Amino acid sequence: MKMYVAGQWIDKPRKIEVLNPYDSSVIDTVPKADAADVDRALASAERGAKVMARLAGYERWKILKKAAELMAERNEALGQLISREEGKIIAEGRFEASRAVETIMGSAEEAKRIHGETVPLDGAPGGVGKLGFTLRVPCGVVAAISPFNFPLNLVCHKVGPALAAGNAVVVKPATDTPLSALRLTEILLEAGLPPEGIQCLTGSGGEIGDLLCADRRVRKITFTGSRDVGERICRVAGLKKVTMELGSNSPVIVMPDADLDTVAAAVAATGYANAGQVCISTQRVLTTGKIY
C-alpha cells in the first residue's frame, strides 16, 4: 500500500515489509518515510487544520457517521486485515473492527456536542448582571502515534475525536501494522473528509516519530505504547499538549468471598486475549494464601 501525504497516495523506493506473524509471509509493503515526507505532511496538515476548523460540527458529524457506516459494511474485510497483519485470531479481528465502528460513530456524535461554558461574573465588584463565556476551539495539527496491538481501533481512538473537534491529524501507525490505518484513511476520504484533513505516514518510529513530536507545527500529540517511548516523547514535545496511554502492570485482586470459577475464567480471558498483548491484560493476581 502507499502512504497518504499532502493529498496524494505516494510510494517510495525504500520499503518496509509487512509480515503475517503466523508464518512470516509478506502481506504487503509500505513506503519508508523520511524527513522530507514529514515536512510535506506537516505543511499540508497546517493548511488542513484551517479547513477542518471551518467545518461546522454538523459537517464533521456527517463525515464521521458516513465513515462508520462504510466501516460497518466492510467489517469482515477489516477484521481479516487486522488478523493478518497483527496476528490475533479472526474472532478478535472481527471484534476489533466492530469496536472501531463504535469508536468512530461515538466521535461523530460528540462533534455535535462541543460547547463552552457560561460563567456568572457577580463574584467580583461590578460583575452583577454580567456573564462571561468560554468556547472550545481546535488545537490545530494533532500527531497520532499508535501501537501494533490494536491497529485499527486505537487509531480510531485518536483520529475520531481529533477530527470531531475540528483538527487535522497526522497519523503515524506502528511500523509492524500500518495497513489498517491506511485503510481507515481511505475510508475517511471516501466519506468526504477534506484531503488535507488527514495524513498517514509509514516508517520507522525512531526516524520520523521524533521529527513529528519536536516540530512546532504540531500542537498536540496522542500516543499509545510503552512507558519508555512515552517519556521520550514528553521530553521532545516541549510545551505541546500530550495524551499518553502507556503500558501498565495490571493486577487482579481476588477477595476471600470471590466466585473462583468466575475469577478463573476472567483471568484466563484477560490474560491470554491477543496473546497477552493488551495494555490492561491481567499480569498479576493478588490474593490470600488460602485462595492461592
Question: What residue ranges belong to the model's regions?
Answer:
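Periplasmic-binding protein-like
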Residues: G160, R219-T224
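Residue-level signal for inorganic ion chemistry
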Residues: S24, R60, I82, I104, ...
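Generic hydrophobic/aromatic pocket-lining and core-packing "Φ" positions
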Residues: V159-G160, G209, G230, A264
